[in-house]
Amino acid sequence: MKPSPSFPEPVLIETTEALAALCDRLAAEPFVTVDTEFMREKTYFPELCVVQLGGANDVAVIDAQAEGLDLAPLGALFANPAVTKVFHACRQDIEIFLLKFGAVPAPLFDTQVAAMVAGFGDQVGYDTLVSSLAGGRIDKAHRFSDWSARPLSRAQIAYAAADVTWLRPVYEGLRARLTREGRLDWVAEEAAVLADPATYRTEPEDAWRRLKLRGGNRRQLALVKAIAAWREREAMRVNVPRQRIVRDEQIPELAALAPADAEGLTRVRGISSGFAGGKSGRALLEVIASTKAIPDAELPEAPRAPESARPPAGLVALLKVLLAERAGANHVAARLIASAEDIDRLASEDAPNLPCLQGWRAELFGNDALRLKGGRIALAARGRRVEVVDLP
């Protein structure tokens, strides 16, 4: 068992002056660990409640809702190119900071991604990393606390602080391992994606892609797209979860019925007469009416791939075997190398811009995947192992 490291006592930050002093100290360090606590159950946009920062001699729990607190010093720290910002599973945290400061903290390092590159598998949790790399244990008792309630309890402050204190030895352990294996550049490639604001951008016109659609004609597809885009904009405008505007399962039904009035809206299961006759109902009816007026020639093509475009099952199976072999041999999480969608597209089309054909993924898997697809290599079983065989 590794000796448990000693950490500074956590400090609650509630004033701009205290935050500025903290950020000044952390600006002199090579890295700082970061986490957030937020609420999103009742809003479209996450409500930032707490920010945790961990330095060599500082552990701070910042009350982001403290009256009069200006988070500008935090934004300056996040923009400092000399300080690496270390997160675990950073996407939701980054989304919050992008909304708050208009920029992604950089440079950044995500220990979840690093763990997948360092051989910890697909689904490793933060508590497992803390145990494996730092000999510690994470108390999950306050995981689902109401972080918007004030005052914060001592137990909440201790829980929040633990997320960034243990993250320091986790980061140092992962970085040392990746340095030995020559894989820091791999993690840097992933960090570049995480640092791109486009990664977090929500386009209302693409909202329909989250829905599970079955059948339907081109007109219905146009309606699904229009209704989903309207719902996304409306949810953003009033800052409520999109499901509180119109539920996912109601959108295909609305597209199929294409109601022309409030009474028609109420025929969709779960839509009340109050909604149908109100401002939102009228706006939805306008969207439906304008979409019904689109000429047939301008309707979108239904997203049904022809039989010839479906990925050949045999090739998909071979590519998955190659992926599993390369992931296992190199101790890298398979889903970080290539997704199921990547494999299907690789098997069925010429898609040179797929992530699995770029950078370290190409070296590890993509180049041989193309050779396998082109009939230049084969896969052979050797006992419990799978080997790549060059073909003449």
From Swiss-Prot:
Chain ranges of the 3'-5' exonuclease domain: 12-178
Annotated ranges, domain HRDC: 217-298
Catalysed transformations (reactions): Exonucleolytic cleavage that removes extra residues from the 3'-terminus of tRNA to produce 5'-mononucleotides
Enzyme class at the top of the EC tree: hydrolase
Subcellular localization(s) per the UniProt record: Cytoplasm
GO MF, one annotated term: nucleic acid binding
One annotated GO biological process: tRNA 3'-end processing
Highest taxon listed in the record's lineage: Bacteria
EC code: 3.1.13.5
Main localization of the protein described in the UniProt heading: cytoplasm
Sequence similarity: Belongs to the RNase D family.
Name by which UniProt lists this protein: Ribonuclease D
Protein species of origin: Acidiphilium cryptum (strain JF-5)
